[in-house]
Amino acid sequence: MAMVPEITCDEVDFYRDDDDRQFYEADGPNQKKGYFQYPDLCSKESLLEEDGIQLKFTTQPHQFHQTVMVIVAIEKMKHLNGLSSQFFQDNDLMNIFTNIFQEEPITFKNCDIYESDSSFRLVSSQDCTIQDINQKCLALSKASELRALHLNGRNISQQVIFSMKYLLGDIGSQKTHVVLCIKKNNLYLSCVRRGEKPILQLEQIANFPSINVEKRFIFNKVEINNTTEFESAEYPNWYISTSQMDEQPVFLGNIRGGKDITDFILADF
């Protein structure tokens, strides 16, 4: 229930300004003195029933700006449609606040999204050993060359342990991307072109990057039944391969299901 201080039917001094918002400023508005007559408030028995508002007069002191706020609210309510024919509801109060107070605009900034030169980045790793389907192990020769050979219990320690690092690649790609590193020596398998065809080589890198991984180090890990193939991401249809013969270098070949072996068996270490 809105309450205003007692006033008379005579002319009442008041302060006004063209902008209603100045009534709520902390330092007060640029005040102009004037006069107004408010006949609807002259009688204490007067009820604004057509607006659904009941006014009760009291002699309790009120601050001037509180009185002005009530008068401003009443004036704005009298110009709202639909209040006189129905009970005062929550939506009506919300409409009053919307008319009295001005909402501040919401500001926002546009942000640009940039794509990295390379979309490959490391996410996890797995230590494992790798053998071809003829049970030849991969081992380093004295010349730091990766070879495939049969090892028995006495020299099985020559078998290298790989750190197979998994990468996130292109969005929507169904392929599994990995990097193969000989863990003990930080030797990374990579594919580069020499002459007319790509070859497989080892590169020693102390601090391998976790983002923007160059494509020559990346292999597509393809699982078929219980075996795995490693296809070069840089040179599609070229695979890590071993020879049918023993103690031959591991190489990059483009023949699957032929004399060269492209199927491997992985074992967690």
From Swiss-Prot:
The keyword Cytoplasm applies. Its main location: cytoplasm. The gene is IL1B. Residues 1-112 form a propeptide. GO terms for molecular function: cytokine activity; integrin binding; interleukin-1 receptor binding. It comes from Trichosurus vulpecula (Brush-tailed possum). The record marks 175, 183 as: Important for interaction with integrin. GO terms for cellular component: cytosol; extracellular space; lysosome. Potent pro-inflammatory cytokine. Initially discovered as the major endogenous pyrogen, induces prostaglandin synthesis, neutrophil influx and activation, T-cell activation and cytokine production, B-cell activation and antibody production, and fibroblast proliferation and collagen production. Promotes Th17 differentiation of T-cells. Synergizes with IL12/interleukin-12 to induce IFNG synthesis from T-helper 1 (Th1) cells. Plays a role in angiogenesis by inducing VEGF production synergistically with TNF and IL6. This is Interleukin-1 beta. Keywords: Cytokine, Cytoplasm, Inflammatory response, Lysosome, Mitogen, Pyrogen, Secreted. One of its GO terms (biological process) is vascular endothelial growth factor production. PANTHER family: INTERLEUKIN-1 BETA, INTERLEUKIN-1 FAMILY MEMBER. It is found in: Cytoplasm, Cytosol; Secreted; Lysosome; Secreted, Extracellular exosome. Belongs to the IL-1 family. IL1B production occurs in 2 steps, each being controlled by different stimuli. First, inflammatory signals, such as LPS, stimulate the synthesis and promote the accumulation of cytosolic stores of pro-IL1B (priming). Then additional signals are required for inflammasome assembly, leading to CASP1 activation, pro-IL1B processing and eventually secretion of the active cytokine. IL1B processing and secretion are temporarily associated. Monomer. In its precursor form, weakly interacts with full-length MEFV; the mature cytokine does not interact at all. Interacts with integrins ITGAV:ITGBV and ITGA5:ITGB1; integrin-binding is required for IL1B signaling. Interacts with cargo receptor TMED10; the interaction is direct and is required for the secretion of IL1B mature form. Interacts with HSP90AB1; the interaction facilitates cargo translocation into the ERGIC. Interacts with HSP90B1; the interaction facilitates cargo translocation into the ERGIC.
